[in-house]
A protein has these predicted regions:
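Membrane-embedded alpha-helical bundles of multi-pass transporters/translocases
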Residues: 1-250
């Protein structure tokens, strides 16, 4: 019952569930296989169009490591991790909208991936920010009720992470079905082998569904009212309580 009284925890959990709607990442391999020519990197390239999906993940994901290293600075600039998460998602939204309009024709694909990578730098600190907010919610509930709920809180976090992954995978599968996707192997070229719906929608789904998910992710965060001043007050009072308890026990 304490979990359902923990508004901060519930709002961040809801944000994570809404973030799971960004299933485009699960469609990246399909996009590169069926929409990019096998000789995109040159006729004698050892990496075909399908191998570009690995390059995509590196270019769009690796820059996030910089954000991870700068997590504390991002928190300071944004005056707390809740605001930081909102800024992170906003950067992702702007980057993906820009990448969508850049497109993937010819060399534009490289620019689109680079833009997504740059916009994703702050997102590298997202996991750190979420964990910090979960810890804040535990402290807040202890301050409010006198009881700590680390075990059940992080158990809940793990469970909902699995649920989120299931939602993402399920939506990707549904999208492929609606696009009339048919697996094809052994073709000399895969361009033009899928339905018109697939060719039309696979790019916007890959690029824009994470942006939509980021927008939805922001909404629950707007209802978290926990300022750095409140956090400092809670930490100070908890420290005083624990010191008083320790002195009584000794």
């Amino acid at each position: 019952s304490l979990l359902f009284k923990n508004k901060m925890l519930l709002l961040v959990t809801l944000a994570n569930l809404l973030g799971a709607l960004g299933f485009g990442a699960n469609l990246v391999t399909y996009f590169f296989k069926y929409e990019i020519a096998a000789d995109f990197l040159g006729e004698n390239s050892l990496i075909g169009a399908l191998g570009l999906s690995t390059i995509y993940y590196i270019m769009t994901g690796l820059p996030g490591f910089l954000g991870m290293l700068a997590a504390d600075k991002i928190k300071k600039w944004c005056h707390g991790y809740v605001n930081a998460l909102i800024v992170m998602q906003a950067c992702n939204i702007l980057a993906r909208i820009a990448a969508y309009f850049i497109g993937f024709e010819g060399k534009n694909l490289w620019f689109a991936m680079a833009v997504i990578g740059l916009g994703g730098i702050p997102l590298g600190a997202a996991a750190i920010a979420q964990t910090a907010i979960f810890c804040d919610s535990i402290d807040y509930m202890e301050w409010k009720t006198g009881k700590r709920t680390e075990g059940i809180t992080f158990s809940m976090q793990t469970s909902f992470t699995k649920i989120s992954s299931g939602i993402t995978a399920g939506l990707a599968t549904l999208a492929l079905h609606l696009l009339h996707y048919k697996p094809i192997e052994g073709a000399s070229t895969y361009l033009g082998t899928q339905s018109a719906a697939f060719d039309r929608w696979i790019w916007p789904l890959v690029i824009l569904t994470p942006a939509i998910a980021s927008l939805l992710y922001i909404v629950p965060l707007l209802f978290i009212r926990y300022t750095p001043a409140q956090r400092a007050q809670v930490e100070q009072e908890l420290k005083a309580r624990r010191a008083a308890t320790d002195s009584q026990n000794t």
